[in-house]
Amino acid sequence: MLALSAISLGLAASPSGLAMTGRPVTVRMGTASDEMGIPCVGECAIGAYPNLPESVHPGVVTGSAMVDLLEDAKAKGYAIPAVNCVTSSSVNACLEAARKMDAPIIIQFSSGGSQFYAGKGLDNTDFKAAIAGAVSGAYHVRAMAEQYGVPVILHTDHCAKNLLPWLDGMMSASERYYAAHGEPLFSSHMLDLSEEPLEENIDICVEYMQRMAKMDMLLEMELGITGGEEDGVDNSDVKPEDLYTKPEEIWEVQKALQAVPNARFTVAAAFGNVHGVYAPGNVRLDPEILGKSQVFIANELGLPEGTKPVSFVFHGGSGSDINDIKKAITYGVIKMNIDTDTQWSYWNGIKEYEAKYHDYLQTQIGNPDGDDKPNKKYYDPRASVRSAEASTVDRLQQCFEDLNCVGVLGLGEMSEPSNVLGPRRGALPV
């Protein structure tokens, strides 16, 4: 659970009405732009957002800025989309969608996605490719998030017990980054030990929380099993009762993790969640579990009626009923994962591009316009990949709307980018 209360964060609880801030006129050079030598102009020069706490800025947010953003989501009743990315192209689509919707976003990498980011031609013994891919992706996000002018929580997804060396490698990278910049490379990590006994799950989470707290990082932990299949993990045959978390289990997590100084954490509590998309009626979500858990834990903590001490994560958001999504947000969900639907949207963009230009994609030379006409501009990968990105942006726009996460930044509509490089002799198509 995200430690948004004074007990869990070790900070004074913020008032429900967060102060509005105007946009400063000074140009901001963030650590990524400064370190990489990327000019910080246009959207990147935004110092703060009219509708968000002053600490929240363009680029990757960590520590107190991340907490302020998530606290704002809970207070105002929106959740932030968390999208699994496997290439720089999918990262860029997420950033574009966030700017178009005037909203923050969570970009996350799974172990398999991280390995793919590094390239399947790289050996993954001891998870070295997965570690390298995640770190490479993190630097790309840091470089480009500022340019798009949106705040990003940089996260990694399901880390089961057998994947702990992958997490250790990323933590080491964050420790080195923290020593140089005063903040971690990643904002947060997820530990998924839901298939382990509860006591072992909690013990390992406490161990990692202690290490992460020293860098102001957030830990997402999972209770109960998310069904379905994702990233090579198949839980399609799990017992139905294991898909639903009990309030008492969440309380055990709360007690253990809040004892760690500077602890920041969220809970991915199972309430019937399933990875993937299934026919209507096959998935039975019960968001009421989240509401009952809030009441139970608030009572245990002696908090006023109506308090939501837990910040929940909604796994398996693809294909979920909009009514279940809206209800879950009212019970304290501040993050919803989406992967299957964005995988489909990316592929569908390529599929539709191929269908539209099929007759221009069969040979290098020769098409309906003439046997001697070249087809280079059609099979240039930038064309089909851009179609995939645009399709993904469209799907994510729906996700932002479903999560009440539109206009959160207060910047207004995004102006259309100028993508023309100008006339050049011998230029490639742009």
Regions from the PLM with identified roles:
Residues C85, L154-A160, K308-S320:
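Glycine-rich beta-to-alpha transition loops that act as phosphate-gripper elements at the mouths
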Residues G37-P81:
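N-terminal amphipathic alpha-helix/helix-capping segment at the start of soluble metabolic enzymes
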Residues A355-V430:
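Extended, intrinsically disordered, low-complexity segments
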Residues N162-M170, S318-Y331:
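Catalytic cores of alpha/beta
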